[in-house]
Amino acid sequence: KFKLRNLERVAITINYTSAPEIPTVHMGSRTTSYIMKGVTNAHSNFAKAFRENHWYNISGIDVYTMSNNMSAIAIIGNSITDGKCSTDNAQNRWPDVMSEMLQLKHKITNQGVLNLGIGNNRVTVPGGFGALAKERFDRDILMQSGVKKVVIFEGVNDIGAARSGSSETVARKIIESIQGMVKKAKARKMKVY
């Protein structure tokens, strides 16, 4: 149990008895991970650690509160959401800025922002990174705790990957898939943007 303030950054330490053969990785996290041999904790000297600008092994963190009025805005997207062109360790991806604006400028302190962006992700055209947005929507959006609002910010990579002459077909498939995501979210009383 930790007492956290709004917008507070959290560091996570994981100790393994042996390294995973195939670790999960978030290549575009734009946040430094520190990797060391042996048991580590908050008091370890991370100056000697191997540094890598990726996240490993964490699929999510649930934050529990005593308030009944808390909720989350979940954003499904591609590299633009994931943080492409943001600054390493600055936490200035557009969902980070959105969260700060809601909290600091608009005084909306009861909503968290969940960034479910994956670089080069696509809605319907295979070949990008991660599961297609239409396939990961249930897991990445609908199964998140406390989500009341959803932002769908996907499709540009499908358009870019479309073969010549197939743009109308790709556009139709994107629209149909996003409409399916909207229908699922609305069935759970979520507001969709």
Where are these regions (language model features)?
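Secondary-structure boundary elements
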Residues: T65-M70, E100-T109
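Solvent-exposed loop/turn segments at secondary-structure junctions
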Residues: S18-A19, S79-G83, I118-T124, V156-G160
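Short connector loops at secondary-structure junctions
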Residues: H106-V125
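Alpha-helical cap/lid subdomain in secreted, periplasmic
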Residues: N89, D96, E100, H106, ...
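N-terminal secretory targeting modules
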Residues: K1-I76, T81-D88
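Structural recognition of the beta-strand scaffold that forms the well-ordered cores
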Residues: A72-G77, T81, Q111-G117, K148-E154, ...
